[in-house]
Amino acid sequence: MAFPQPRPQAPQLPQHLWRTVDCQQGAVRAVRFNADGNYLLTCGSDKSLKLWSVSRGTLLKTYSGHGYEVLDADGSYDNSQLCSCSSDKTVILWDVASGQVTRKLRGHAGKVNCVQFNEEATVMLSGSIDGTVRCWDTRSRRMEPIQILDESQDGISSLKVSEHELLTGSVDGRVRRYDLRMGQLQVDYIGSPITCVCFSRDGQCTLSSSLDSTVRLLDKSTGEMLGEYSGHVNKGYKLDCCLTDKDTHVLSCSEDGHVYYWDLVEGSLTLKLPVGKAVVQSLSFHPTEPRLLTSMEGRVQVWGAEPEDAAENES
Amino acid sequence: MASDEDSDEDFVTYGTPLEPLEEDEPSRKPIPVHEQTVKDEKGRYKRFHGAFTGGFSAGYFNTVGSKEGWTPSTFVSSRQQKSEKHNARPEDFMDEEDFGEHGIAPREITTTDEFASERKDQIKDKARAVSSLAALIPGDPGLLEEFIAPARSSIGVELLRKMGWKDGQGVGPRLKRKPRKQNTGRVYGCSLPRNGSEESEEDDDEFAPENVTFAPKDVVPVDFTPKVDSHGLGYRGLNPLQALGGGSGSGHINLFTLQSDRTTNLFGDRASGQERRGGIAGQAFGVGAMEEEDGDIYHKDSMSNYDNVLGGEEPGDGLYGWTAPQQYTKKKNALKRVMAYSGRILDGFALASEVTEIKTVYPPPDLPRDFRPVHYFRPVIDPSTVSPIVAQALQLSRGQLSQDASQQGRHKLDSTQRRDMLGESALQGPSSVFELLESKDRERLTEIRKAAESQKPSESNLSSAVDRAVVVASAKAKAAALQALSSRFQSSSTQPQPPSETQMALNAWSGPTADASKTFKPFSKNPQKQARYDLYISKLKQGDKDAVELSLDSSMTEWERGREREEFVRAALLYKPSSSSLSSRFTHGKHEEDTDTVDVAQEQENDVDDKQAAVKMKMFGKLTRDTFEWHPDKLLCKRFNIPDPYPGSSMVGMPKVKRDKYSVFNFLTIPDGSQVNPSDPKPSSSTIPRVTAEASSKKSRWDVPVQASEPKDAVSAFLSETRSEVSATQQTEAEVKTQTDALPASATSEVKVAQSVEKQSDQKNEEEEEEEEEEVRPSMDLFKAIFASSSDEKSSSSSEDEAEEEEELAPPTSEAAQSTTTSGTVIPPIPAQFTPAPDINKAMDLKHLTVQSVPSAETTAQSTQSSLNAPAKSQGLDEEEFGPRLPPPGFVPSTHSPQMKKQKKKDKEKHKGKKHKKEKKKKKSKKHKHKGKQKKRHEESDSSSDDTDSNSEDVDRDVPTSELLQRLKNLKNKR
């Protein structure tokens, strides 16, 4: 290249609390950014799904229609639709603006742990405790799933979708990657029940946290372990992990009320962000900026890389 | 017609049949047009392009480009590799479906020339006809060719010749002379007068020899040439050559093919010797002008001319013109006289030519009255290894035996005595049965000795102790002898059955838990085998020790028996009564699609043990990765904007293969020789089959990372009579009796049930039972009692919080538990509360109890075995969830209260408290009480303050039904 690469900035870690949102919906089972990171979704244990503005912390809409606590949610790329799953074994596709249920999909035999849109929001994929992943068509009116992936021998705890891949983490201690393009299923044995899986942003690695209090970074193509991150506590609860927006750090919730930041390459603990006293249950990293959402009990906290005033001044 | 239903299946059908219409079914929505698709046999969508533009398959299945069709082939020819001349055949330009059944060039399995019959090849004939036009000799194309071509006969003819067939003969077994037929031929319609040749046959009878056989007559196969003309039956029309050219000498034109191919084929033999009258003859035509006779014009047709039986007798006399010499006939007559038989011979039967010899049957030898088919080896016990009491007792008993041994013959002597009598030297091998015993059993015997020694019974007690020891020792020896017996009978090809398994099976089934009617039938495919298995099970239930041996079929070979023995024991273990209680909850499906096979993933995962090892060494990569073929749904690919990785395949998901469904060997793995090693010093590893090891590893990832599966106490797994008699009675029973006197009798009996279940519970059982717990969940009370008691008696603080919770939930029972938990007994005392119906004799109650006691026994066994496992286990019990749990919901701001915070803190403390080890039990229980009361108050306040709080799921789970009821009442009162 003609021009030298710009010097990489020192990675900024969201460690300043911007605001705390008391969601008033019981325990927040999951908190998720939407596709562009301006809004956030909270899944409450009081059967409601709520949409908030990140910047102001105001409630925009409440989506009620589930029969039991909501366990996961996702927003479509165009912000027109939401999907959520619940302990009532259903997956619901919502219309964002009207707050109406577009489709309520039954079929899972147990509570549905995780749900994701695919890239074009044409398919919803939901993983359930019954050990299946079901692929629901959002385009047609069919109430049956397009395909049922029942390879797992135990419940699916987490699931992520990329352009052509589907990553599932199961309680049977295996991370499965369904490659649609290759028509392959790759199973990586971790051993301990998986609580959360992620793709790295470059799509070359998979991150999986398991109940042995370890987060592992595996090479996608070979299955070799690139990094192992431990120090946090994750022994019994289904906790989230993720990568930062630039893949520089690995984040994980912990049962001791902290969010742990590890350097991705060195594997060393960079930061131990105290969130509260209870279990940090869910977290979500902003897709482009160093911003973090954490949920603990009934509250959601928004974290930024610098104090909020400074950030606002900049922008 | 009844046969219609059967023949239905033979029909070839096309298309999908309409589903049977059911009356009460709600009318279904009609399938919209856009979902009505046409698919070909491979599941590809068909698009209709118009009848003249390709039909359904224009292009290469509606795509441009194909495997071969459109891509230009490249011509490469080098010095090394000359390009082959490629002749394009018409098939190269055909689609796959053109070769199909309805295509233009259907491919079907045809016989090759060599095996083909001599039927004329129509295509070849045509080709020949075409080529004949251009041939050298016009009109006869293949003449020269046929001169030159080697004579070739088909393989069938060759084979027949090898078997002794000659040209002109018929095919089939050689025949004796047949009894003469009365009516040699049937005539349809116009009958022809008989000729002389037939009459001459009448006196052939006496010339027929007895021992000469004839080849059957050759029958020209029926040639069903279709009738294509519009003439009447049998009418040929004028052959102009014959009519005009005067081909035939008779000058008579025969319009009827009475001797046409058809008739000759059918009645070839009849017409063979006959010279038929020419001319048009018959009723309908009267007498021709040229005929001389005109007698039989007004012929009357009679019914006897018609045949009213299908099939009928075979015409022909079977003599074939051979005249037998005179002596044959005489001999035959003589024979006939010998075999004169007074009675009537039934149709279809013939008199035997030879009288069968009567075989003399020798009766089996009489068995002596005291004969027993099973041999027990007399124990030879080394006095140094056994306690003096046992040795003494044995010597005593042997002394008695040896006294009368001299009178009773060698069968009463043992091998050493016989050896001594014969003056032989001792064998080199193991000299005593004790060395054949497993180490565990030896240990147990030493245990007995220790127990006996420690007791140091008084002189008066001694005799009874000796008696008991004798009983025990003899039972022991019997068992050992049985083992030796079974191992002896097993051929070398089968592994020696681990004796513990039969023992386990016995333990599993001999208890009162067994329910005969609801057992699983693993061999239902093979009714005889199943019957044998049922016999085995019923014997097991009676506590028969050699149930396997007795129930096996003695007519089978030894190898088969060994195999079946192994199967039965394993099946008995697998489908033991506890799981049958589970299965009784379900009914069998009325409708099974395919009972024989089950779909199994084609590619199987690698060994999990290897992976675990790899994970331990952090060697992720090849070792931990499995790659499978996986077929995404077509629609899924479409939605993901991705080309189908397997175009043309209609499969979805993982490739499956069919496997046998109910073969036991699908579920069982025969233990390797390395695993079943009787001389293995480790007590547990030798006895637990491989399946269980895997199962336990599966279990360990169930909810919480449990410590690596510890070797369980083997003693609990195998409970021999020794233990129940000696150790149970001596150690526990006395204590139990003194302390649980207050308990009603039913409770103790239940304890016994629980114990018996505990005995059989090895690791595998535990897993099964754990699964079962999800289904058959006993009342919360039972858990409470057990946890309260077991945790206390183990005095391990690890299960403290569970006990806390339980006590907080049921304060009334905790006291009862306390009163009983001061003991250090192995058997958990169960408060009287849990036996609702004291009448235990009722079968229903018994069943109920056993179902309940299964998990309890299991948990107690666990808690006694490893205190480390206890928290994880009981957590799993408390939680109905699978997999990682959800964190507690914390507190909703509206119900903010300091009390709740306090509870939160305590929760934390509890978590920390897990790491503590031992604590004083009494102190703890006091604390529990206190805490329990406090918490109860909290909960009540919680429920009263926030009625609509739905997130108290975790709390709700642990609340017993009684308290729920109470809460409900409170609610009602408020309203």
UniProtKB/Swiss-Prot annotation, chain A:
SMART domains, per database record: WD40
Gene Ontology biological process terms from the UniProt entry: mRNA splicing, via spliceosome
Single GO cellular component term: catalytic step 2 spliceosome
InterPro entries documented for this protein: G-protein_beta_WD-40_rep, WD40/YVTN_repeat-like_dom_sf, WD40_repeat_CS, WD40_repeat_dom_sf, WD40_rpt, WD_repeat_MORG1
Keywords noted in UniProt: Cytoplasm, Repeat, WD repeat
PROSITE patterns hit by this protein: WD_REPEATS_1, WD_REPEATS_2, WD_REPEATS_REGION
Superkingdom field: Eukaryota
Keyword Membrane on entry: no
Pfam families in the cross-refs: WD40 (PF00400)
Repeat region (WD), residues: 23-62, 65-104, 107-146, 151-188, 189-228, 233-272, 275-313
Subcellular location: Cytoplasm
Chief localization: cytoplasm
The keyword Iron-sulfur appears for this protein: no
Sequence similarity: Belongs to the WD repeat MORG1 family.
Role according to the record: Molecular scaffold protein for various multimeric protein complexes. Acts as a module in the assembly of a multicomponent scaffold for the ERK pathway, linking ERK responses to specific agonists. Also involved in response to hypoxia by acting as a negative regulator of HIF1A/HIF-1-alpha.
Full protein name: WD repeat domain-containing protein 83
